[in-house]
C-alpha cells in the first residue's frame, strides 16, 4: 500500500466524500457500514448504521416487549420531565416547543419536531439560558426507544 502512496485509501475517502460531509472510522465496522445521521438531526443519537439489519416488530415482541409504534418511536415527554429539565423555564418550553396531548403527556409541536428546526429558532440566541433550553429541547426530541429504519420503515 505504501508503494502506491495509499491510493486505495485515497480513492475510498474521495468516494465517501461524495455521500457524507463528515465521517469517522474508529472501529473495524467503519470499513463495512456507516453511522448515518439524518439531515434533520444536530446530534447523532437518532442515526443508524447503513447498511443495517433492523429489528422487526415480531422480533421486538419475541423478547417480551409489546411494541407500540407511536409510544416507542416518538419522544416521550411528560410534565415531570419538563419541570426537571427546564425548571422555571418549563412554562416557556411548554408554550413554545411542545403541545399537551393528554393527562401530563406532551408532544413536540410540528414547527419544532426536529433538531434542525429548533436550531433555526435559536440561531440568533447565544446566551447561556438559550443554549440550556436549546440543548434540553434537543434531548427531548432524541428521547425515543426505537428509531424507524429509513429503508425498511416497518
Name every feature range the model reports, one short phrase each.
Residues 1-154:
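Catalytic cores of glycan-processing enzymes that make or break glycosidic bonds
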Amino acid at each position: 500500500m505504501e508503494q502506491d502512496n495509499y491510493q486505495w485509501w485515497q480513492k475510498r475517502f474521495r468516494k465517501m466524500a461524495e455521500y457524507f460531509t463528515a465521517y469517522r472510522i474508529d472501529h473495524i465496522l467503519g470499513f463495512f457500514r456507516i453511522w448515518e445521521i439524518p439531515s434533520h438531526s444536530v446530534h447523532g443519537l437518532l442515526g443508524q448504521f447503513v447498511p443495517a439489519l433492523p429489528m422487526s416488530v415480531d422480533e421486538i415482541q419475541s423478547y417480551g416487549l409489546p411494541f407500540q409504534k407511536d409510544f416507542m418511536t416518538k419522544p416521550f415527554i411528560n410534565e415531570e420531565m419538563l419541570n426537571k429539565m427546564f425548571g422555571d423555564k418549563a412554562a416557556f418550553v411548554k408554550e413554545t416547543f411542545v403541545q399537551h396531548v393528554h393527562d401530563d403527556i406532551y408532544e413536540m409541536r410540528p414547527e419544532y419536531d426536529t433538531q434542525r428546526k429548533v436550531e433555526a429558532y435559536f440561531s440568533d440566541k447565544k446566551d447561556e439560558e438559550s443554549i440550556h433550553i436549546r440543548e434540553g429541547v434537543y434531548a427531548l426530541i432524541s428521547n425515543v426507544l426505537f428509531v424507524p429504519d429509513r429503508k425498511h420503515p416497518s
